[in-house]
């Protein structure tokens, strides 16, 4: 990249940071991205708070690669010591909410797309999609535009991975479980106290082990994350509500895991959604071979992204470090941002 292009990329990231873009409230950052497309002469489409564009010489006879990252953020961590919406550049870092997750990846993919937008001699088409509601796996994010896009053969999802290539990603089921008992006054004996059943059921979840252990993602992980019961000190509640977080490796189908819990769990249990399945791409895929030639490390990701909503092959890669995501005083290194653009280009040059 030229110095001017580097400055432009940094400037765009800072504009994005300055603009609050909480999930479901991304309208203002979308305006910034629309302006960027217009300034660069790129035709785009919009649905809700999602934008996408095709390369200028899109050819339906060619396979298509989707480039995707999100522009929504979580609420700022309460431990911030700086203004989360003021993009300070200091010590080679750009600070601000969404700088790392996933502003850096989004900007890197936009400048990658800009560099190939006018190319006529590519083996693939490219679509760039800047999408909403990733942080909440919302219905009005990438899921809402998939049917509006041409057939996608493969996707690159931009998330902070230190430019390592995530070739597998855990799926997620959140279960709401209910332990039933008999309500009554605390002064009287009660042999059907829902709270007293809790330790045995918690132990069932804690002892749970699934046979298939992934080399990339490890075992299926089951964690009770919330417990709620009672409303008054002298009343024995009729039920205890618990929330269970289940992270699924690529060796299981999400419906298989759901069926197990529904039939085997010692209390009532129901999944909130079965949309966030695990993902995995064949090690023989062209993008994996390209990464190997460049010495890019592959790994399995424990964190969730929009990959879970896709029904075509995908990988996750981007500048930044996922450990900084959702943290106080979030930041990305300037070099990570600019190097990310070049790594994306090198990765695709091997196949396009």
Regions found by a protein language model. Give the residues of each.
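A structural signal for short hydrophobic beta-strand segments in well-ordered beta-sheet cores
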Residues: 44, 87-89, 224-227
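Predominant activation on well-ordered alpha-helical scaffold segments within soluble catalytic domains
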Residues: 14, 34, 107-110, 114, ...
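Acidic/histidine-rich catalytic neighborhood of metal-dependent amide-processing enzymes
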Residues: 102-174, 178
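Active-site metal-coordination/substrate-binding segment of hydrolases
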Residues: 62-127, 334
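N-terminal helical capping/dimerization or prosegment-like subdomains
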Residues: 2-76, 239-243, 257-260, 334-345
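Active-site metal-binding loops of divalent metal-dependent hydrolases
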Residues: 71, 134, 160, 186, ...
């Amino acid at each position: 990249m030229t110095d001017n292009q580097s400055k432009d990329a940094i400037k765009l990231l800072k504009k994005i940071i300055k603009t609050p873009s909480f999930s479901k409230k991304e309208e203002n950052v979308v305006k910034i991205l629309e302006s960027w497309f217009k300034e660069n002469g790129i035709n785009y489409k919009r649905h809700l708070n999602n934008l996408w564009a095709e390369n200028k010489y899109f050819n339906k006879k060619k396979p298509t690669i989707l480039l995707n990252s999100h522009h929504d953020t979580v609420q700022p961590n309460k431990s911030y010591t700086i203004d989360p919406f003021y993009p300070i550049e200091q010590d080679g870092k750009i600070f601000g909410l969404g700088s790392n997750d996933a502003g850096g990846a989004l900007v890197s993919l936009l400048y990658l797309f800009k560099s190939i937008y006018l190319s006529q001699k590519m083996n693939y088409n490219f679509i760039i999609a800047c999408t909403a509601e990733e942080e909440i796996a919302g219905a009005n994010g990438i899921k809402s535009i998939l049917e509006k896009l041409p057939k996608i053969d493969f996707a690159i999802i931009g998330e902070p991975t230190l430019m390592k290539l995530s070739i597998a990603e855990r799926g997620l089921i959140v279960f709401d479980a209910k332990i039933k008992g008999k309500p009554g006054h605390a002064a009287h004996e009660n042999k059907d106290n829902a709270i007293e059943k809790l330790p045995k059921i918690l132990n069932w979840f804690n002892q749970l082990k699934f046979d298939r252990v992934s080399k990339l993602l490890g075992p299926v992980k089951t964690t009770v994350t919330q417990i709620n019961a009672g409303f008054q000190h002298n009343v024995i509640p009729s039920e205890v509500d618990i929330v269970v977080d289940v992270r699924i490796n690529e060796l299981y189908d999400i419906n298989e895991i759901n069926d197990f819990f529904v039939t085997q769990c010692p209390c009532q249990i129901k999944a909130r959604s079965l949309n966030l399945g695990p993902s995995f791409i064949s090690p023989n895929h062209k993008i994996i071979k390209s990464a190997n030639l460049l010495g890019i490390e592959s790994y399995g990701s424990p964190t969730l992204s929009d990959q879970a909503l896709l029904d075509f092959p995908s990988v996750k890669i981007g500048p930044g470090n996922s450990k900084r995501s959702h943290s106080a005083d979030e930041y990305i290194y300037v070099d990570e941002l600019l190097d990310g653009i070049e790594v994306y280009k090198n990765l695709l040059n091997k196949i396009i």
